[in-house]
Amino acid sequence: MTELYDVAIIGGGPVGMFTAFYAGLRDTKAVLVESLATLGGQVTSLYPEKKILDVAGFTGIKGSALIDSLDEQMKLFPIDIKTSTTVTNVTKTNDLFTVTINNGSSFQAKTIIITTGKGSFEPRKMQVSGVDQLVGQGIHYFVTNKHDFDNHDVAIAGGGDSAIDMATMLNEFTHSTRIIHRRDQFRAMEQSVKQLSQSSVIKETPKKVSQIEKQSDGKLKITLAQVKNDQVTNDICVDDLIINYGFISENKIVHGWDIQPENEGQAFSVDQAMQTTIPGVFAIGDASHYEGKADLIAVGFGEAPTAVNAAIRFFDPQRRGPGHSSSMVIQDGKLI
């Protein structure tokens, strides 16, 4: 018999995880589907060591610690979690949605909440000869353990939030840290730039990487040049180069489903209840778009209760609204 859920949450990043918890708090039968082998989305895959500063109640929480806490929170309820599972199609028949997954099986749901972010992601590559051959041999696009760089000479290429945060974080453990950016000004949050300016991180600006050579001692010789005229400015020798030019995202699989809500780029247009142009289908976090939207984890957390409560009103209009969580008691995965 086909499994029927009240809510199907598609996307197991931090916003999807909190949505699943809140769906449990509202005593719904929920399933959380994630294409990767582990939950946590980009936080787990890209910056588990990075401190996240804009989550309410924390002066800064490491990415992996945030995901661990969200996982513990979800365990309060019997949420059905499907990892290594890609949703290949979503169709609607009468009042139910049929969700087909990559093994060919399917289940049904009364409502859908899309929490896929901007979709799959891959790093923007550095367009310098020889870089691809040196990935894993001193050149990195991802950092999963900051202590891999203890006492190393490290350079970070990039000028956005992630590059600056990486530089200031690693600078506590490295022998030396440099940041290479094409402009004099960094494109990051003001406090992050201020923290960088007060640190001992060496700024190589405005410069670009023009050549990289692996030396006999294992170090990387990086030739830097002026951005405007390609004139060489200086060489630096480092153990590691971390390329942090951001990521390219696409929701190709989502945009291949039979149901197709209106979208704005990679995100779906939503109303004030976080509902898309298809009744019963909601989108939150980076997967949603409305005027003034800020793509932050904190914003997605706030949108989760709105979407879950709206979903409940959709499939059960007579159910009473949400109470205050401080008046609830959870025992053995149930609200009592």
Curated annotation (Swiss-Prot):
Q: Which cysteines are joined by disulfide bonds?
A: none
Among SUPFAM superfamilies, the record links this protein to: FAD/NAD(P)-binding domain
**Keyword match Oxidoreductase:** yes
One MF term from GO for this chain? ferredoxin-NADP+ reductase activity
What InterPro entries does the entry give?
FAD/NAD-bd_sf, FAD/NAD-binding_dom, Fd--NADP_Rdtase_type_2, Ferredoxin-NADP_redctase_2
Q: Which family does it belong to?
A: Belongs to the ferredoxin--NADP reductase type 2 family.
Q: What catalytic activity is recorded?
A: 2 reduced [2Fe-2S]-[ferredoxin] + NADP(+) + H(+) = 2 oxidized [2Fe-2S]-[ferredoxin] + NADPH
User: What cofactor is this protein dependent on?
Assistant: FAD
Top-level taxon of the source organism: Bacteria
NADP as a keyword?
yes
- What organism, scientifically named, is this protein from? Leuconostoc mesenteroides subsp. mesenteroides (strain ATCC 8293 / DSM 20343 / BCRC 11652 / CCM 1803 / JCM 6124 / NCDO 523 / NBRC 100496 / NCIMB 8023 / NCTC 12954 / NRRL B-1118 / 37Y)
Q: How is the cofactor bound?
A: Binds 1 FAD per subunit.
Q: What are the UniProt keywords, alphabetically?
A: FAD, Flavoprotein, NADP, Oxidoreductase
- Give, as one word, the top-level EC class: oxidoreductase
> Subunit arrangement?
Homodimer.
> What protein does this entry describe?
Ferredoxin--NADP reductase
Q: Which HAMAP family match?
A: FENR2
Identify the residues that bind FAD.
34, 42, 47, 87, 121, 286, 326
This entry's Enzyme Commission designation comes to 1.18.1.2
